Amino acid sequence: MANHVSFYVNFHEINDAAKARWKEMTQNLVKENYEYWFGDLWVDGKEGSPTKDEVRKYDWTTDHIGPKWCYIQDFDEDSFGGYSAWSAPEDGLVKILEELEKFDPNIITSITYDDEMPNFVGWYVYSGSEMEDGCEDDDEEIREAVFDQNPHLREHWDDANDEWQCDEDGDMTEEAYAAEDEYRDCMYEVINEMQATGIDDCIKFIKEAREEQPAQD
């Protein structure tokens, strides 16, 4: 069974025309079991558009969305979130942005994601439909980030065996159990901070670059 990857997309800079187009696209979504099939965004009944059956085929989803399946769970005028198989729907997001930038070439968008373990987490920022910057961290890098902010937890980690410390019988020590619980409690706070910092810095860079090179009429 595929690992679920949760994702969340924010349109940080988006004009009214692009918002209106996004609203049109989301009107194609049909709720099924409290969620929406990602590919239905493009099922609008117009000539040349895919059908409901087509966007559910493996070849279409992997070519246009990325993951073999992907669901949207919630959306509004400037964000949406959901989950997918094995990876985030980066291709699907670019496909959305290629449409929205027709109405707002200065649209700025971010996506954050993590798999359910998490084995990896990441973020990307897009200027228009072009990826400006991003980062993906694996479980070891996540652990190092947590330990850097909570050095007392590192004392109970066994680097040689890549696990929490155990006693002579191979059982986790009481101190290691407590450290693991604390680690789990603060892990997503550290992850969210890493992602937010990266996104904020990238958006600041994009805006400063645009101020230095204003758009030409």
Regions found by a protein language model. Name each.
Residues 1-35, 211-217:
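Short, extreme N-terminal segment that most often corresponds to the first beta-strand
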Residues 23-59:
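Surface-exposed, low-hydrophobicity interaction/linker segments
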Residues 47-217:
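Charged interaction segments
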